[in-house]
Amino acid sequence: FIKEKEEIVFSILPTATQYARNSFFAGLMPSEIAKKYPQYWKNEEDDGGKNLFEKELLEANLKRLGKSNLRWSYNKITNVAAGKKLVEQFHKLKENDMNFLVYNFVDMLSHARTEMEVIRELADDESAYRSLTISWLEHSPLLDVIKKASEEKMNLVITTDHGTIKVNQPVKIAGERNTNT
């Protein structure tokens, strides 16, 4: 692989997936999504999934940018079976001008790190957490997709909607849902 460019960027967006990923695909701030596309936006206090319309937000974004003529795909991988299916159907990705792939595992792992005792035991410190993440990647269908993209000389942009920070002494803060407004 050839790393052409690496840069660190920051944002004023809250890092919660609901805000970060929806904004990423929509190309809009959360308040703008709520105004322009209320059918795709759920507020914090609303029930139901908060990231169910990423594909629709992406499509609207491409249209706004004058790129609706592009052939593109959107895939959200939430388990190993879906990842393997994507690898099997890689030939279809080659036909597109752009492919957007959401891979949820590392996000799920970071949440599990605080919620599941077994993950806390496996990844007690930053070094162990990185090792666990690298081990997962080395054995995941995602690496197969990256290798196939490299073999096909496809351009690949890897990004994230937010990061994670290990806190040594976590404190749970409880309050009404509108405490911060």
Model-predicted regions and their roles:
Residues 1-181:
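Feature captures the catalytic ectodomains and active-site-proximal regions of enzymes
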